[in-house]
Swiss-Prot record:
Heme binds at residue 435. It comes from Rattus norvegicus (Rat). Changing residue 116 to S: In strain: Wistar Gunn. Changing residue 187 to L: In strain: Wistar Gunn. It comes from the Eukaryota. It catalyses: an organic molecule + reduced [NADPH--hemoprotein reductase] + O2 = an alcohol + oxidized [NADPH--hemoprotein reductase] + H2O + H(+); testosterone + reduced [NADPH--hemoprotein reductase] + O2 = 2alpha,17beta-dihydroxyandrost-4-en-3-one + oxidized [NADPH--hemoprotein reductase] + H2O + H(+); testosterone + reduced [NADPH--hemoprotein reductase] + O2 = 16alpha,17beta-dihydroxyandrost-4-en-3-one + oxidized [NADPH--hemoprotein reductase] + H2O + H(+); (5Z,8Z,11Z,14Z)-eicosatetraenoate + reduced [NADPH--hemoprotein reductase] + O2 = (8R,9S)-epoxy-(5Z,11Z,14Z)-eicosatrienoate + oxidized [NADPH--hemoprotein reductase] + H2O + H(+). A cytochrome P450 monooxygenase involved in the metabolism of steroid hormones and fatty acids. Catalyzes the hydroxylation of carbon-hydrogen bonds. Metabolizes testosterone to 2alpha- and 16alpha-hydroxytestosterone. Catalyzes the epoxidation of double bonds of polyunsaturated fatty acids (PUFAs). Converts arachidonic acid (ARA, C20:4(n-6)) primarily to epoxyeicosatrienoic acid (EET) regioisomers, 8,9-, 11,12-, and 14,15-EET, with both R,S and S,R stereochemistry. Preferentially produces 11R,12S-EET enantiomer. One of its GO terms (biological process) is epoxygenase P450 pathway. GO terms for molecular function: arachidonate 11,12-epoxygenase activity; arachidonate 14,15-epoxygenase activity; heme binding; iron ion binding; monooxygenase activity; oxidoreductase activity, acting on paired donors, with incorporation or reduction of molecular oxygen, reduced flavin or flavoprotein as one donor, and incorporation of one atom of oxygen; retinoic acid 4-hydroxylase activity; testosterone 16-alpha-hydroxylase activity. This is Cytochrome P450 2C11. It is found in: Endoplasmic reticulum membrane; Microsome membrane.
């Protein structure tokens, strides 16, 4: 048969299939902009900032609407009420993990982030319980974070107040906390293997937020047959995965079943307990995928929040001064901050919350999946439908947070200056897919920020009026623009008295 004829017939079949699927699905799903055959609404979406496109569509179609990314329909939830109703009130039905093809090429549906069904339920439950176990041990997670915070301070002191880009140093600290939990050891900040891992984490988070990766996730065939930055993402993933596998093998050789040292040992013990269960979710492949998930998620999100937060503190010097005054009054300079201090530091607590709200790190979160046919607000959403959750619409809700585009710790303070909780604070998402490391991340952010500001004054290289805090990249994540800063050491009280 003529190759040209084959091509024409193939394209025609795809076109007809696309038209049939779209017309069949649109009668049942929530309304939305009219999709084009094959490419769907892709041309109507600003890939450099999907969140802005979602906000625009919500003004036309309301809090629940449908977008076609390629030939797949995605139901979009916009606003607190719609998101809460779906993720919390109907948590089980919306608990699936949606399509994310680039990551699926690596994890194969295993691990704790991109898995579904029993794999996800059992691995997530085990991971949370194991993290809690370490939190109740002799050397708690808070101890590990405090220790790492002091290592971070010593590394920052080496700059001697000279300007530098803090990206890698701020990435090393949360990564080392995760390493101490998973591998039982931390890295020196100059370790070449560590720096290589940090570079790959940082590069992947940046590339994940690029328009090209959004296109790859929309049209998965690109991943296997076309060149592009997605290949570097996969290369980085496989490097990290192989590194984790080597660490697992080392643990297998030195395992003491009665004295588990870290997360890997606990998982290996679980594998041994279930070795006669052919349906067990606890396999070597699952262990590697889970540790890789924890390694990546526990590093880049926290480090980016730290980096973005310090940029905001550089710009808002009045806010920084108030935090440092509170640190001086409650903690002083001669002991390390601890989580017990937080209840006495409402302003600092509000600042940490406002940083997370303002930067809106992952504006549309990872996609969810409907686990069974469901009627939602008079719409029929069939099992297997992908769901996009707009966290931006909640974190920047102008009714809950007046002037949401303004950085203002007052969003989390009452009229008496006490810390004020908000149900709209959802940087970690909500429901059954809420970030498993939320407690760890909250502890890290409070202790790292307070320890840095206890020991250093921040100085910008440019006038504070010229500091730009708008994201440099707005895709999967909001990444801060490049900046350099000076960390000027604050003299401790004991060093001051020695000079008197």
């Amino acid at each position: 048969m003529d190759p040209v004829l084959v091509l024409v017939l193939t394209l025609s079949s795809l076109l007809l299939l696309s038209l049939w699927r779209q017309s069949f699905g649109r009668g049942k799903l929530p309304p939305g902009p009219t999709p084009l055959p094959i490419i769907g609404n892709t041309l109507q979406i600003y890939m450099k900032d999907i969140g802005q496109s979602i906000k625009k569509f919500s003004k036309v179609y309301g809090p629940i609407f449908t977008l076609y990314l390629g030939m797949k329909p995605f139901v979009v939830l916009h606003g607190y009420e719609a998101v809460k109703e779906a993720l919390v009130d109907l948590g089980e039905e919306f608990s699936g993990r949606g399509s994310f093809p680039v990551s699926e090429r690596v994890n194969k549906g295993l691990g704790v982030i991109f898995s579904n069904g029993m794999q996800w339920k059992e691995i997530r439950r085990f991971s949370i319980m194991t993290l809690r176990t370490f939190g109740m041990g002799k050397r708690t997670i808070e101890d590990r974070i405090q220790e790492e915070a002091q290592c971070l301070v010593e590394e920052l002191r080496k700059s001697k107040g000279a300007p530098f880009d803090p990206t890698f140093i701020l990435g090393c600290a949360p990564c080392n906390v995760i390493c101490s939990i998973i591998f039982q050891n931390r890295f020196d900040y100059k370790d070449p293997t560590f720096l290589n891992l940090m570079h790959r984490f940082n590069e992947n988070f940046r590339l994940f937020s690029s328009p090209w990766l959004q296109v790859c996730n929309t049209f998965p065939a690109i991943i296997d047959y076309f060149p592009g930055s997605h290949n570097q993402v996969l290369k980085n993933f496989f490097y990290i995965k192989n590194y984790v596998l080597e660490k697992v093998k080392e643990h297998q050789e030195s395992l003491d079943k009665d004295n588990p040292r870290d997360f890997i040992d606990c998982f290996l013990n679980k594998m041994e307990q279930e070795k006669h269960n052919p349906q067990s979710e606890f396999t070597l492949e699952s262990l590697v995928a889970t540790v890789t998930d924890m390694f990546g998620a526990g590093t880049e999100t926290t480090s980016t929040t730290l980096r973005y937060g310090l940029l905001l503190l550089l710009k808002h010097v009045d806010v920084t001064a108030k935090v440092q005054e509170e640190i001086e009054r409650v903690i002083g300079r001669n002991r390390s901050p601890c989580m017990k201090d937080r209840s006495q530091m409402p302003y600092t607590d509000a600042v940490v919350h406002e940083i997370q709200r303002y930067i809106d790190l992952v504006p549309t979160n990872l996609p969810h999946l409907v686990t069974r046919d469901i009627k939602f607000r008079n719409y029929f959403i069939p099992k297997g439908t992908n769901v996009i959750v707009s966290l931006s619409s909640i974190l920047h809700d102008d009714k809950e947070f007046p002037n949401p585009e303004k950085f203002d710790p007052g969003h989390f303070l009452d009229e008496r200056g006490n810390f004020k909780k908000s149900d709209y604070f959802m940087p970690f998402s909500a429901g059954k897919r809420i970030c498993a490391g939320e407690a760890l991340a909250r502890t890290e952010l409070f202790l790292f920020f307070t320890t840095i500001l206890q020991n250093f004054n921040l100085k910008s290289l440019v006038d504070v009026k010229d500091i730009d805090t708008t994201p440099a990249i707005s895709g999967f994540g909001h990444l801060p623009p490049f900046y350099e800063a000076c960390f000027i050491p604050v003299q401790r009280a004991d060093s001051l008295s020695s000079h008197l």
